[in-house]
């Protein structure tokens, strides 16, 4: 049986922490879709098309990963993709309550959809896209936290 997993998020922008989880998921599952959410309720710095393009560039070395933008409910997107696994990262205990609610709702909407939680590597456990953007906005060096092409795109966007 082929396993297909979806790793969803806004990824505004994709960080090395996200990339670490994605790389690890790509070793666990036959195929992984990095599903980039339109997230109209969030004020994203990058458009959906920009986030998809940046993520495609950062993941081209992962042969079993596809990057796809979506604006549907996650459960509906998973059905469209014939996937039955959601990969989510848990950085801290604070993430758990929200992730548990999401997992329960997604399972209610699609009973065959299972959520699998991965812990970030210690190096990336404190990183979030929001934090990286905030540091960059104030002139801090974020090159350790983002793939090179995304660092350039972020600096350009913040000019």
From Swiss-Prot:
Molecular function GO labels: ATP binding; pantetheine-phosphate adenylyltransferase activity
Source species, domain of life: Bacteria
Subcellular location: Cytoplasm
Site (Transition state stabilizer): 18
Pathway(s) served: Cofactor biosynthesis; coenzyme A biosynthesis; CoA from (R)-pantothenate: step 4/5
Regions that span the bilayer: none
Primary subcellular site in the record, as a coarse category: cytoplasm
Positions bound to ATP: 10-11, 18, 89-91, 99, 124-130
Record-level GO cellular component terms: cytoplasm
HAMAP family: PPAT_bact
Complexes and interactors: Homohexamer.
Protein name: Phosphopantetheine adenylyltransferase
Species of the source: Pectobacterium carotovorum subsp. carotovorum (strain PC1)
